[in-house]
Amino acid sequence: MANELTWHDVLAEEKQQPYFLNTLQTVASERQSGVTIYPPQKDVFNAFRFTELGDVKVVILGQDPYHGPGQAHGLAFSVRPGIATPPSLLNMYKELENTIPGFTRPNHGYLESWARQGVLLLNTVLTVRAGQAHSHASLGWETFTDKVISLINQHRKGVVFLLWGSHAQKKGAIIDKQRHHVLKAPHPSPLSAHRGFFGCNHFVLANQWLEQRGETPIDWMPVLPAESE
C-alpha cells in the first residue's frame, strides 16, 4: 500500500496536547472514584486498533458509546457478542436485508469483522458514564475526533464517509468531497430511520464506489471471530 502512515505517526503529537491529556486524566479519575465508565479502559481506542489508517476504506461516525452494561467496546454501533442488538443497529441490519442480496440478519451485533475490512467505526466521543448519554460530550473527545477526521481527509484518498444524522453531518462538514465520497442520510435510530435512512442504499453505494476504484468491496455480513477462522 502506498500510504503506510499509521495512526501513531499522525496522532502522536495530538496525544501530547494539554486538552487530550486532560481528557484522559478526567476519565481516569472518574474511574478511580468508582464511577462506571463505558467502554472499559482497554477498549476505548479499539476503532484505531482494528482499522489502521492505511486500511481505512469506509468511515461510519457514531456519537457516543452505548451506556448500558457490557454493550460498548470501542466500535461505533457495535456491541459485544451475547448482548442484545440495539435498535439503531437492528435498523442498519434491516436496510442491509433490503438492499444486499443474500444478507440475513445475524443473531449478534458484533461488528469487528467490518472493522477488520477497513470500516472505521468511530464514535465522536469515546467514553460515557453508565446510564448517562452524552455525559462525556464536553471532555475534549470531540476535538480529538475532529483531528482524526481531518487526518483521514488529508492523508487518504477515496474514502467513503457514511454520515447519518445531523451530528455526524456537522462533524463531517470539513471533508473534501473532491477527494472522498460523502453519503448522507438520517440516523438509523427508530426516531428517524423512517425519514430516509431506510432506502438510502448506502451499503450498496459504498461498495459500488470501492469497486469502481478497484478495491475489494466490504462484506457487510457481520461474523463473530470464531466463525471467520
Swiss-Prot record:
GO cellular component terms attached to this protein's record: cytoplasm
Pfam families the UniProt entry points to: UDG
UniProt catalytic activity: Hydrolyzes single-stranded DNA or mismatched double-stranded DNA and polynucleotides, releasing free uracil
Enzyme class: hydrolase
E.C. no: 3.2.2.27
Catalytic residues, chain numbering: D64 (proton acceptor)
UniProt GO molecular function: uracil DNA N-glycosylase activity
Domain of life: Bacteria
Keywords per UniProt: Cytoplasm, DNA damage, DNA repair, Hydrolase
Subcellular location: Cytoplasm
The keyword Hydrolase is annotated on this UniProt entry: yes
DNA damage in keyword set: yes
One of the GO biological process terms: base-excision repair, AP site formation via deaminated base removal
Annotated NCBIfam families: PRK05254.1-1, PRK05254.1-2, PRK05254.1-4, PRK05254.1-5, ung
Function: Excises uracil residues from the DNA which can arise as a result of misincorporation of dUMP residues by DNA polymerase or due to deamination of cytosine.
Entry similarity comment: Belongs to the uracil-DNA glycosylase (UDG) superfamily. UNG family.
HAMAP family xrefs: UDG (MF_00148)
Name recorded for this polypeptide: Uracil-DNA glycosylase
Lineage: Bacteria, Pseudomonadati, Pseudomonadota, Gammaproteobacteria, Enterobacterales
Encoding gene per record: ung
